[in-house]
Amino acid sequence: MRAELNKGLIDFLKASPTPFHATATLVQHFEAAGFQRLDERDTWAVETGGRYFVTRNDSSIVAFRMGRQSPLSGGIRMVGAHTDSPCLRVKPQPELQRQGFWQLGVEVYGGALLAPWFDRDLSLAGRVTFRRDGKVESQLIDFKLPIAVIPNLAIHLNRTANEGWAINAQNELPPILAQVAGDERADFRALLTDQLAREHGLNADVVLDYELSFYDTQGAAVVGLNGDFLAGARLDNLLSCFAGMQALLNTESDETALLVCTDHEEVGSSSACGADGAMLEQIVQRLLPSSEDYVRTIQKSLLISADNAHGIHPNYADKHDANHGPKLNAGPVIKVNSNQRYATNSETAGFFRHLCMAEEVPVQSFVVRSDMGCGSTIGPITASHLGIRTVDIGLPTFAMHSIRELAGSHDLAHLVKVLSAFYASHELP
């Protein structure tokens, strides 16, 4: 099971270079399992035992299985994750021609570790909006091939490079695509028009706009002398999206189960398709006949917010609290913060620990050092919007927000097992 899950995650990561592609890949899996797409613009008629999914902005998805009994009876078991990761996004007018090279201006999306982006074989993917035969359409594209690179400056020209230096995102991050002649004019939209034709056979009249990100073409892999680790891009947080999907597909229960994977977590979630928007609340409201039933159901429900945790690094162990250093391959981590950067409380933490013990899944705890700031997740945001009890958990990871992150190769199976047990559970606290 462990090897099969890791292989599935590696394939999922390869197919999901952007939130748009991640959502499309999730849709493919759910449709293959018999889930029915719902359109938010239509009237819904969900049925007992039915399986459905909804997307918004092509970058967020809510998938759910209606239980054999009403959600009002036993509540809804929810798992939440996010589809986006820190990256470099192409600017609206990106063409740069400097010293005979064609480059693209980029904007840093989220809290990216920038240094690892240098000297990588980069490709480009995302969503393009265009006009064809008088109609406005959108399509996902993925160049797949390594079409760009951000070369480092040689140490001979930067003698203090190994002493640390501030990276200027405006000047130092534009990737190089090609060499151009002095009188040659680079045309990025023409490149996108060609890609639409090459990848989809579409003859666009004009490219109107786009949301495109660079990504590392090196695929994810199981690594280490004994295969202990899983290395790859976007583990934060496609690992949790994949685990939640597997758990939802693997379980049948009398209770209603739901997976929500939203966009824009890395930049605050404040969007129509982010956790700070109304998407999840609006969808759950439509599953219940009245506002009274909605409130009662939410108070019987529970959310597991799944987002990667900081594993204790052997070279930087002093960055962790001495008693709270999560280890790779030692199971999921319950994340706690007294200032509500995580939504965990003693009741929800206790329930998650109970699930892990019942499934013989190891479990750990994380709290940030008292002299350091703490990150956050969709957990507190969703708990605030819905009023739902929430526990923040995640798998321990090294190099979070790097272009290539590292997790334990045993931990995905741990997470899928406990999330499956959660979806199948008959009683919530």
From Swiss-Prot:
Zn(2+) binds at H82, H156, H401. Its EC number is 3.4.11.-. It comes from Pseudomonas syringae pv. syringae (strain B728a). This is Probable M18 family aminopeptidase 2. Its cofactor is Zn(2+). Coiled coil: none annotated. It is an enzyme of class 3 (hydrolase). GO terms for biological process: proteolysis. The keyword Isomerase does not apply. Disulfide bonds: none annotated. Belongs to the peptidase M18 family.
